[in-house]
Structure formats: C-alpha cells, structure tokens
Amino acid sequence: MSDMEKPWKEEEKREVLAGHARRQAPQAVDKGPVTGDQRISVTVVLRRQRGDELEAHVERQAALAPHARVHLEREAFAASHGASLDDFAEIRKFAEAHGLTLDRAHVAAGTAVLSGPVDAVNQAFGVELRHFDHPDGSYRSYVGDVRVPASIAPLIEAVFGLDTRPVARPHFRLRRRAEGEFEARSQSAAPTAYTPLDVAQAYQFPEGLDGQGQCIAIIELGGGYDETSLAQYFASLGVSAPQVVSVSVDGATNQPTGDPNGPDGEVELDIEVAGALAPGAKIAVYFAPNTDAGFLNAITTAVHDPTHKPSIVSISWGGPEDSWAPASIAAMNRAFLDAAALGVTVLAAAGDSGSTDGEQDGLYHVDFPAASPYVLACGGTRLVASAGRIERETVWNDGPDGGSTGGGVSRIFPLPSWQERANVPPSANPGAGSGRGVPDVAGNADPATGYEVVIDGETTVIGGTSAVAPLFAALVARINQKLGKPVGYLNPTLYQLPPEVFHDITEGNNDIANRARIYQAGPGWDPCTGLGSPIGIRLLQALLPSASQAQP
C-alpha cells in the first residue's frame, strides 16, 4: 500500500493486528470499494483482565468431579475477568477520534461495538472495504492487514464485522428420494425414522427427569420457528410444550421463511429435539446474522445472559476451521472458555461433510466451533433400534450426496491433556502432527434413520449432526436437574469415565469421497464417533457424587 493509498492519518503510528488477514472465497470477484453513506458496525474484542487466572481456574475445576466444582457467578465475572473500564475508555477515545461511535460495551464479554460511515471505518482500522460477488451471494471484505494506532493495539485481540461473508452452515440433512432429491416425509412413509423419544429410549436417557430448572440456549444464524408448528409437534408426542423464547442479537430476529427445506429446518429441528426430551427446561433461541461478528455476539450474549442464564448452549452451525481468520477463532475460543468458567456446557455439531468437511483442497478438515477444546463435539451415527433397544449402530456415511459425520484431527488446536490417553491418531494431513481429536461423542444423525419432526407445519424426516447437539443438550439438562447444579465443562470428565457409559461404535468410516478411508471407527475413541453414543442412565450414575467418591 503506497503512502497515497493509506486510509489512516499520516501522523499516527500503526501496528498490524495479527491473525486478521483473510483469503477471499474461491470464485469471488472483486467489484470495487464500498462507497456511500452506509453505516458499518464493527465488534472489537478487548483483552481480558487476569486471563491466565481464568484458564487456571477452569483447569482446576475440570479436574474435580462435577458435583464438587465451583463455577464463577455471572454477576461477578465482569469485574474479575471482563475487559477493564480503562480499556473501554481508550476505545471510546479511539472511536471518537476517527468519527465512530461506541454503540455498546459488554464488559463481561470484553466486546465493544463501534459504528460509523465507511470512510471512518476504513481510516480507523487501516483497511479499504470492498464488495465481492460470489455464486453463493455477495459480501463485504478487505484485502491485506488490519492496522490500528500503536497506542491501542495492545488492547485489541480481534476485530469482527469488517468481513460479512457467511462463516457457518447448518448441519442438518433432509431425507432423500432414491434419485437424490430431497423430500418432505408423510406420516405413512418408511418406518426407519424415529421421534426424539424413540432415540432417547434407545440411548437409555434417565427417566423421571425433564430438565426442570435448566435453560438451553440454541444459537441460530438464520430462519425462525413457527409457534403453531411447535405446538403441533409437542402435542403429537404427548409431551408438554417447553417455554421457548427468542433473543435478538445484532438486529436478527425470529424470521421463519415458510420453507421447510431452508434454515427453518435447522431452527425447528433444534427446538423440537431439545424440547421433546427436556420439556421442563426453558429454550432460549439466540438469533444472529450469519457473519463472524454475529456468531461471536450470539455466543457471548448467551453465555453471559443475566436474564435467561443458560446452563447449556447448543450449536448446530459451523464451518471448516481453516476458513476462519486465526484471530476470530481465538476470540470465539475465549468465549467458550468463559462458558467453562461459568459452568455452561457448550455442545456443537461436528459437521455433515465427512473427513474433509466439504473442502475441495485434497486435505482433511474438522469443523469449528466443534474443534474447540471447550466444546463437546457431537458426531453422527446410523442407528437401527427396535422396542427401545439398539440392534446396530455404525458410523453415518452416505457418501458425497448423502453426507457423513465430520471428524478428524484439528490443525489449529493442540491435543488436550484429557485426550492424551484416547489414542488420537496424528492428522492425516502431511506434516500436520497431533491435534485435538473430533468428535467427543456421537448420536443418531443419518437421515435414513432420522428424526421425525414438523417444520413449518409439514411433517418431515431430518438427520445430520445438527440433531445430535440438541439431543445431548437435553441429556445434560436432565443430568443437571438430578445433580442440582450444572456439570459445566464436561470434556475432561467424559474421558475419565468407564467405557461402559458409552455404546462403542466400531464399524464404518467418514471418508465421504471413499478415498483412503483414513479415519476409521474402532474400539475406544475414534475420529468418526468419538467415545461413542450415550448410555444415558450410566452416564448420570457415573457423574453422581456417590460414583465419584467410590472411584480410587
């Protein structure tokens, strides 16, 4: 960039913010600079107070049995580990000096939302915002680095909102016709579909519990739910309808499209699976734009929500971890660390595009946010059950047209200590080495053995790992209810439990392209189904205080 092209004031010394360079999407066409009086909103993630102490606290608590853990309170978190008020004051000065306004400050999450005209944003962050056209839709982005005044660079960990491309896709799959088209299923269609109640029975969810006293947060980046459809569905199952509330994030709201094949399918699948199995819990649905800023703000809003106070967060959206800017992944992971400290269990779908996660670069990829070590990654199986008993369960893999469970080895997150004895293989990518293994657990996800749900008033069958995240969310809600407190960060605990609390999946692979079949199911943990599908009552018993006291 020449001196003539610099968008910032010449007298300011600038520093590059690491991890913000973005590669443009394949087939994207640069259509020139963003102009006009459009107002741009940007989320700035500030450094936290005593971040090392927070990580140490989470590690200490994770080593304890769930009933013995001491979680931080939301009310005190902002003062102890949020961004400092002095840093917010500096960001306000920075904003005002560059023609921006500070619209919102979230102390606990450590985020500041700034807005202003295009020219002001360009000058403040040392970028030139540009329009890009793409077959999947146009978006705004920038080329090169993000640069801020050297005086405030140490305060800033990430900047979200300069790039508006969708960062995630919903991980659900509709059942297909034989010729490969998708179809809505009538009540009289093939019997290889289950209600959530059927699946819970097969997985031996503990009975006599309904999630009372819990709040399950569901993150949605599009679509909406129809209250009539939800009422129809829960009535058909003979269960009480849960309380469902919507929360608007960054202007997004509950906006059902009326198209059961669109994002409404994701939203209502999530609510219906979680609500059917934990009808006593409150379901809080956080709607946000499908951008990096929207996704982050939805998660931080849910995790730090002082009104609904979720104890569980279910995420059915994600994308290949290498499609995220490094700074964005780090900031999202920080939000998941917050959740762990607050005793919030976060679950995410592992993806529906096999070991490549839908990428076409010849490499193996895992999905984010499932790859975060603070997230319980949920893979997918093909379940055959009868009369409440599992007859056969294998890795879900229907090939490139039908989808397959995500899973593999992260290229970004190192191998966590709690996975060191799980025999996580090295990454299949050349020279990549070890890393966080994905998924942690699994459940029914094959559309051929999918979930019968009602989407926009239409009965259909849906699969995908999207169904597994709310399935486990409901199980955690029941466990929390029984324990009388949230289990919180579950990952380290699950890897210490006896293998008998899971149904081990030992057949299949997630090589969607049928190449080397590098990631295979096998005894114990594997990169297709993790530790296996749950045996719910055994999992609960293993987490009860009496069980932990009996262990050596």
Swiss-Prot record:
Temperature dependence: Optimum temperature is 70 degrees Celsius. Retains 60% of the original activity at 80 degrees Celsius for 10 minutes, but loses its proteolytic activity after 10 minutes at 90 degrees Celsius.
Catalytic function, reaction form: The enzyme preferentially hydrolyzes peptides having an Ala or Pro residue at P2 position and prefers such charged amino acid residues as Glu or Arg at the P2' position. In the oxidized insulin B chain, kumamolysin preferentially cleaves between Leu(15) and Tyr(16)
One GO cellular component term noted in the UniProt record for this chain: extracellular region
Domain Peptidase S53 as annotated: residue spans: 193-546
Domain of life: Bacteria
Impact upon substituting S466A: Loses both auto-processing activity and proteolytic activity
Record-linked InterPro entries: Peptidase_S8/S53_dom, Peptidase_S8/S53_dom_sf, S53_propep, Sedolisin_dom, Tripeptidyl-peptidase_I
KW Secreted (keyword) present: yes
Record comment: activity regulation: Inactivated at 22.4 and 37 degrees Celsius, but not at 60 degrees Celsius, by aldehyde-type inhibitors such as acetyl-Ile-Ala-Phe-CHO and acetyl-Ile-Pro-Phe-CHO. Insensitive to the known carboxyl proteinase inhibitors pepstatin, diazoacetyl-DL-norleucine methyl ester (DAN) and 1,2-epoxy-3-(p-nitrophenoxy)propane (EPNP). Not inhibited by Ala-Ala-Phe-chloromethylketone, an inhibitor of the human tripeptidyl-peptidase 1.
Any one Gene Ontology molecular-function term assigned to this protein's record: tripeptidyl-peptidase activity
Cofactor(s) the protein needs: Ca(2+)
Subcellular location: Secreted
Principal location class: secreted
Amino acids binding Ca(2+): D504, I505, G522, G524, D526
Region (Disordered) location: 1-34
Composition bias type Basic and acidic residues, residue spans: 1-17
Subunit structure: Forms monomeric and dimeric crystals.
Function (record text): Thermostable pepstatin-insensitive serine-carboxyl proteinase. Preferentially hydrolyzes synthetic peptides having an Ala or Pro residue at the P2 position and charged amino acids such as Glu or Arg at the P2' position. In vitro, specifically hydrolyzes the Leu-15-Tyr-16 peptide bond in oxidized insulin B-chain. Additional cleavage of oxidized insulin B-chain at Phe-25-Tyr-26 is detected at a considerably lower rate. Can hydrolyze collagen and the chromogenic substrate azocoll. Shows lower activity with albumin and casein. Shows very weak tripeptidyl peptidase activity.
Domains (record comment): The core of its prodomain resembles the prodomains of the pro-subtilisins and of the pro-protein convertases. The prodomain may stabilize (by interacting with helices h4 and h5) a folding intermediate of the catalytic domain. The catalytic domain has adopted a mature-like conformation already in the proform.
Protein name per UniProt: Kumamolisin
Lineage: Bacteria, Bacillati, Bacillota, Bacilli, Bacillales
Annotated gene: kscP
